[in-house]
Regions:
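A conserved mid-protein helix/loop that constitutes part of the nucleotide-sugar donor-binding site
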Residues: 6, 15-29, 134
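Glycosyltransferase donor-sugar binding loop
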Residues: 11-17, 37-50
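Nucleotide-activated donor-binding/catalytic signature segment of Leloir-type glycosyltransferases, i.e.
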Residues: 49-68, 79
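Conserved donor-binding/catalytic loop of nucleotide-activated donor transferases
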Residues: 75-77, 96-106, 110-111, 121, ...
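Acidic donor-binding loop of glycosyltransferase active sites
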Residues: 75-90, 105
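Short glycine/serine-rich donor-binding loops of glycosyltransferases
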Residues: 92-97, 115
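Conserved acidic donor-binding segment of nucleotide-sugar-dependent glycosyltransferases
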Residues: 120-122, 126-133, 141-147, 162
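A short, well-ordered alpha-helix in the C-terminal region of glycosyltransferases
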Residues: 135, 142, 149-163, 172-175
């Protein structure tokens, strides 16, 4: 919780297959939960975003264009979503997932591709298809009211992120070079 808000963030390209329609539906479904807010950061210019949404208004969603510094967004988020459509786009890695974990932010990610190598169900987050909108919304609502689980997920997220640290990678490369 940040300022009594459970902030759900998604960072992605302005592409339908990245799950933007699903994100909007989930936010709409949770609109009556005043303590939950949504943040969508798109890797696009503002004019492209304006054209895509054509002046739609969202009660509980803040939409941002391309950002140079994401730290301020991560540091004020409670949960990060990756809603890539499992039948249209398979994440091979998922940099935003690892970044979220490094900030100690739990994640909800697709149950295929790279994310399943990063996230263990129930430890750092949850593996749920973006097409399971009700299930994602229910999990968000549950987490927003369960501080203990969020604290445990956050601790596990930070620990998992260490596996992807630059120092660890450099150490492994040095071992190979020196072998």
């Amino acid at each position: 919780m940040h300022d009594d808000k459970f902030v759900v963030m998604m960072i992605c390209s302005l592409k339908v297959y990245k799950g933007i329609p699903e994100f909007l539906k989930i936010a709409k479904q949770l609109e009556s939960n005043n303590h939950i807010s949504f943040r969508l950061i798109l890797n696009s210019e503002q004019n492209e975003i304006d054209k895509y949404f054509q002046n739609q208004k969202f009660e509980n969603i803040e939409i941002f264009s391309k950002q140079k510094d994401l730290e301020k967004f991560y540091s004020t988020s409670s949960l990060v979503l990756n809603l890539s459509r499992v039948d249209q786009w398979v994440e091979t890695f998922g940099l935003t997932i690892v970044e979220a974990l490094a900030f100690g932010i739990p994640v909800i990610v697709p149950p295929i591709g790279g994310p399943i190598e990063i996230v263990e169900e129930g430890l750092e987050g949850f593996l749920i298809s973006s097409y399971e909108i009700d299930k994602v919304a229910k999990k968000i609502a549950e987490l927003s009211n369960d501080e203990t689980t969020c604290i445990n997920l956050s601790k596990n997220a930070k620990e998992k992120a260490l596996i992807f640290s630059e120092d660890l990678f450099l150490g492994k490369i040095q071992k190979v070079v020196n072998a």
